[in-house]
C-alpha cells in the first residue's frame, strides 16, 4: 500500500468457542468500523483480530486462570512486534487499544492490566470477569486509582439488559475504588452479538482521542 501515514491499532478479541473470524463473520465489525470512520465518529485505525486459543470448552483440565492464557505471550511477544514491523502503525502505548467480548473481555483485563506500559485504552463487552479481588488483583492497580486513571485514557464496560454476567456490579465496585470506567447498557439484548456490536460501536469513537 502506498502512503506514509501511520495508524493506531485496536486489538479486538472474540469469545469462548469462537476464533479470529468471529468479529468479522458474525460481529460485522468491518461495517461498524467503516461507518464510524466515514461519519467522523472514530479516527482511522487498524483492527487486529487473532485467535485467543479459547475454542475448546472451558473446564477440560484448565483452571479459570489458565484458560486462554497461552494467547498472552503470543500477543505480546509475537503479534504486536509483527504488526509494528510489517504495517504502517504507530508503535507506542498511546496508540494501542485492546477490547474483547465475554472471555475475550477477561483476556483484555489480564493483558492490559498487567502491561500498562503497552496499552492506554481498553474496553469489554459482556466480560467474563468473576470474583476479582479489586484491592489486590493485577498488581493492585485498582487500589491506585490515580495511577490507573492517568495511564488508561478510556475504559469502558458494556453488557445487555437480559444477561447476568455481573458487569454492572463490577463497574460499581471499580467506581467505588475511584476508577474511571464508563458503563454502557444494550437495551433488550442478552449474551449475543447484537449486544457486542452495539458495544463496539459505542467504544470506538472514544479511543485514540486525548481529552
Regions found by a protein language model. Name each.
Residues 1-211:
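Non-catalytic cap/lid and distal C-terminal segments of serine-dependent acyl enzymes
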